UniProtKB/Swiss-Prot annotation:
Keywords: Cell projection, Cytoplasm, Methylation, Nucleus, Phosphoprotein, RNA-binding, Stress response. This is RNA-binding protein 3. The modification Asymmetric dimethylarginine is found at residue 105. It is found in: Nucleus; Cytoplasm; Cell projection, Dendrite. Arg-105 is dimethylated, probably to asymmetric dimethylarginine. GO terms for biological process: miRNA processing; positive regulation of mRNA splicing, via spliceosome; positive regulation of translation; regulation of translation; response to cold; translation. The gene is Rbm3. The modification Dimethylated arginine is found at residue 105. It holds the Pfam family RRM_1. One of its GO terms (molecular function) is RNA binding. One of its GO terms (cellular component) is dendrite. The modification Omega-N-methylarginine is found at residues 47, 105, 120, 130. Widely expressed in the brain. Highly expressed in the cerebellum and olfactory bulb (at protein level). Expressed in neurons and glial cells. The keyword Nucleus applies.
Amino acid sequence: MSSEEGKLFVGGLNFNTDEQALEDHFSSFGPISEVVVVKDRETQRSRGFGFITFTNPEHASDVMRAMNGESLDGRQIRVDHAGKSARGTRGGAFGAHGRGRSYSRGGGDQGYGSGRYDSRPGGYGYGYGRSRDYSGSQGGYDRYSGGNYRDNYDN
C-alpha cells in the first residue's frame, strides 16, 4: 500500500519525454522505485502522461507541491497523487465504456431528433433516394454507429 501512496500522476508531458528524462528530473526529491510513461498500444508514442512511484510517500508529497505547474521539456506539467484525480479521471473516461457510449448515442438522438435526416448536406434527406437505415449507418452519431464513432477515436 505504501507504494500506491508514493505513486504520482504526471500529466501534460512533452511527447518526447521518456522514462529516463522523468527519472532524471524527479530523482533529486528522493529514491524512485518505478517510472512509467504511458504509450499508445499501436504506435508506441507517448500519450503525454505517466506515473512516478517514490519509495517514500513523503517524497511524493514534496514533489507534488514543488513540481505541479512547473515546466519540463518545454511543457507545463500537472503532478498529482495517482490514486486521487488521475485514477478518477481515467475511471470516468475509460472505465465505463458502456455508459459513455450510451451517453453519446442518447445525446446524438436527443440533439438531432427525428429531423436529423432533413438537415444533412448532400441533397439526401426528406426520405428521398436513401433509406433511413442507410442514412443512419452513415451518420456516426446515432445508435447504430455510435460504437464505430467512438472506436475510430479510441485508436
